[in-house]
Amino acid sequence: NAASTEAYRAMHKYFGHLTPSQQNEYTGMFKGKNLILISAEAFSPYVISKELTPTLYKLTHEGFVFNNYYQPNWTMSTIGGEFANTTGIIPMWGVQGKTSYAYSKNVSMPISLAWQFRALGYDALAFHNHTYNYYGRDEYLENLGYDYSAIDKGLVLPSKLWPNSDLEMMEATVDSYIQNYVENGVNFHTYYMTVSGHCNYNWGGNAMSRKNREAAEAAYPNSSEAVQAYIACNLELEYALEYLMNALEAAGIADDTVIALSADHYPYAMVTDGEDYYNELTGLNDSEKDTSRYRNSLILWCGSMEEPVVVDTPCSSIDIVPT
């Protein structure tokens, strides 16, 4: 209709007068820094509190603060969000009969973070505290340029649980690449895919929920088991990040290191048996059809930042790699 046509004309005129640029005021801000990128299993901003998760609170309030960040429903469970986080490409079904991540395993991916950092002389490492070849992740991440370790592929954790501990993964991996940087000057880009926040969200089906049950029940005494168990298993991510931050600070390299973190997807398993426990967690009354359901937190933090930078521009997981 006439109104929409006029709107298109206005947009065309506006964009036509813009001068494209590959730079902005923050270009080069983190040049030469190490990068740790984390895809956090079923993470949600409603986990974060100053009292219960002080490390997550610090990372989300003292770096870049993204007020309109989203991790959409890519309809691919974990691997869809992970693909978006690690490539900046929209994950799709039906790419020559395959999903995007499956197709990508056999094509060149030169713009991945790992290959880009390798070209600068960085080590590019990836870790996952679950079975190494789930989703074909071994082929996918190695094709992106990572030296990849996971359960049954070089990563040994003291406990064998479901889900495994994010803290134990950090304890098993962090010291080696920090030491290599401090002693030999080898920069690192490290990628983590966590698992502690995985469903089920109850005391019987989640070892991390059981581990951290007391703290979650004390903080949320009037909440359902589903909400308490979800908070409890995500406390393991908090403890993992606390360990990581302490290690960086002890080595004196927090100022040299950028930490980025995004969910793979919102915790959709909290919608179960006809109950929407995610609404209980959030205090909202939305559904999976609502954009608000996919609003999340993006961490982009470096110890060298003297004050937070607030970003109100809407953005999503496909913006991480280009940024």
Range-by-range predicted roles:
Residues K13-T323:
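Solvent-exposed soluble domains appended to multi-pass membrane proteins
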Residues R9-M11:
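N-terminal leader/targeting and pre-domain segments
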Residues S4-A7:
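Conserved ABC ATPase "signature" region
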